[in-house]
Amino acid sequence: MSHLITLATCNLNQWALDFEGNRDRILQSIKIAKERGARLRVGPELEITGYGCLDHFLENDVCLHSWEMYAQIIKNKETHGLILDIGMPVLHKNVRYNCRLLSLDGEILFIRPKIWLANDGNYREMRFFTPWMKPGVVEDFILPPEIQKVTGQRLVPFGDAVINSLDTCIGTETCEELFTPQSPHIAMSLDGVEIMTNSSGSHHELRKLNKRLDLILNATKRCGGVYLYANQRGCDGDRLYYDGCALIAINGTIVAQGSQFSLDDVEVVTATVDLEEVRSYRAAVMSRGLQASLAEIKFKRIDIPVELALMTSRFDPTVCPTKVREPFYHSPEEEIALGPACWMWDYLRRCNGTGFFLPLSGGIDSCATAMIVHSMCRLVTDAAQNGNEQVIKDVRKITRSGDDWIPDSPQDLASKIFHSCFMGTENSSKETRNRAKDLSNAIGSYHVDLKMDSLVSSVVSLFEVATGKKPIYKIFGGSQIENLALQNIQARLRMVLSYLFAQLLPWVRGIPNSGGLLVLGSANVDECLRGYLTKYDCSSADINPIGGISKTDLKRFIAYASKQYNMPILNDFLNATPTAELEPMTKDYVQSDEIDMGMTYEELGVFGYLRKVEKCGPYSMFLKLLHQWSPKLTPRQISEKVKRFFFFYAINRHKQTVLTPSYHAEQYSPEDNRFDLRPFLINPRFPWASRKIDEVVEQCEAHKGSTLDIMSID
């Protein structure tokens, strides 16, 4: 006998502190869920406020406005007829909790505070909230007076409880709790909970979705049950892009999966599931039954006199469970094309900007940034042509276009909002200038090509007049410090010109009511980690879409875009040697990034991963690389590379304190805002670690020709 229930979860593009906008998106998701016959609707974590409010959560106004929005939602008759699972902060006994509020027909059933808070990486939940440290305990919560008038209730249960309907049992866990070893869904499943909801504020990282889906599928495969995952999506005001992918799973299989990247502000995912499949699946495993009979945690049941199953007195062949489907994953190249593009669109439309300005150097990094803007233009154009009303409204506002205008191609949109500029000097090659121009023509940007030698000469002349000294390049006999100073003059003047052109180009083009353009940066994560950039040069911008992406991944993305977007010009960027073009070129010398850095981009990726993800200091990194790089490199060569990396990392650490806000994409990002917190005054020699490394090198060289047990080295 079937026991069919239709359930709904969603991706919502919420914005921190946009209370009314967030409310409207919640209402729209409820309306869609109800139209599809869902009896339970689950939304993202902290959906009323937006997840990324940060220290604004410490303001009691945020709790006040959350209750005001919540009251408007549940008193709306159109939200009645299904159970609502909505997230917001709640103050209970003068303690602030990250909560889920479950309601039905305008009545609050109970409030469930988050038990295990996310407090690593980009997450700092324990700065704002307190975890609920009373498993299985439920207390009375006194509703605010204004809410009492709406619901007719004075007290509601607050704590670790579950809902008992007439035909099933529903439990909830929140985001991080899925990732913990002792997840709440385990104890709940053993206590008979059949439907588990998870409301999340999970951000995008390259290749991270696999981990999230594996956890959900393994949870329902081991415990049985239905799992509804909801997530925020979009840029809600910070470096993070929440990547949606709402889904519904049952017994280790997926029956519905939402999109990971999209310009849709509201996406509702529904499925019809058969609870008899859950009961049969669980009852067939005897060891699971034994554990359930011995389970010590018994959850408080909140009884509701409602049956959630589809109301039908006899078999209906037109109603059937949703079919199982395979999980969908984007390739890393697709993730780079889509994630930063959606993030940039949210940023642009929400800051009331006119468009973007990009210093287009002819190198692969600025090329990658330009291609992400092109990808954004493709997404916006497709959405507008497919009738996405919010996108149409936003694109007309940004372009200052009439009520009947819709872009007819990505290039049409780019010509209105994307501005690029090649800022050449006598050190620039004809090849890079032509590549920049050809790429601009291919993507449709408004392009400026200028020479800035007179500006550079003016600054050098000013210095010469003031000091009586004139710096010259190294290849002409100058010192290293003169050489760097002359390079930095060019780099920093490009930043000044970028902001000048970003402010005035809309005026030059006669764009009405323009507030200027957003300046885009193009420093990749490896260069940021190594400090291979000039402080306050073109790496200093308003936002940087590639600042969390490695050079290796960017090259793969450009190769992908060349084929996907049919742009053969991109192959010229792939085949070019990465160079800053800040020094004069001769027939015997052309500046090269990797030669300047003393290490390859591939090596930088390894160093970055070991430093951040594996938590290695110089000594531990050296020992790990002895295993990875021997015998291709000698122990002494490995030690020199490790020492060189940490030396330049340390002396350039101060640069990371002022990095342009970048799209978070890589787990070894050196972003200093809150992801990778380190002092910025460090002894670059790491003397004690260096001595220990030298001791190991000497041991290895002494044992040359014989086997050395590296694991025995202390």
UniProtKB/Swiss-Prot annotation:
Keyword set, alphabetical order: ATP-binding, Ligase, NAD, Nucleotide-binding
GO (cellular component) term, any one: cytoplasm
PROSITE patterns with a match to the protein in the record: CN_HYDROLASE
Region (Ligase): 329-714
Single GO biological process annotation from the record: NAD biosynthetic process
Binding residues annotated for ATP, in chain numbering: P359, L360, S361, G362, G363, I364, D365, S366
Top-rank lineage group of the source organism: Eukaryota
GO MF, any single term: ATP binding
The protein's Enzyme Commission number: 6.3.5.1
Disulphides: none
Residue ranges of domain CN hydrolase in the record: 5-275
InterPro entries, per database record: C-N_Hydrolase, C-N_Hydrolase_sf, Gln-dep_NAD_synthase, NAD/GMP_synthase, NAD_synthase, Rossmann-like_a/b/a_fold
Pathway(s): Cofactor biosynthesis; NAD(+) biosynthesis; NAD(+) from deamido-NAD(+) (L-Gln route): step 1/1
Catalysed reaction, written as an equation: deamido-NAD(+) + L-glutamine + ATP + H2O = L-glutamate + AMP + diphosphate + NAD(+) + H(+)
Active site: E45 (proton acceptor), K114 (for glutaminase activity), C175 (nucleophile), S361
Note: Present with 172 molecules/cell in log phase SD medium.
Family in the record: In the C-terminal section; belongs to the NAD synthetase family.
Protein name (database record): Glutamine-dependent NAD(+) synthetase
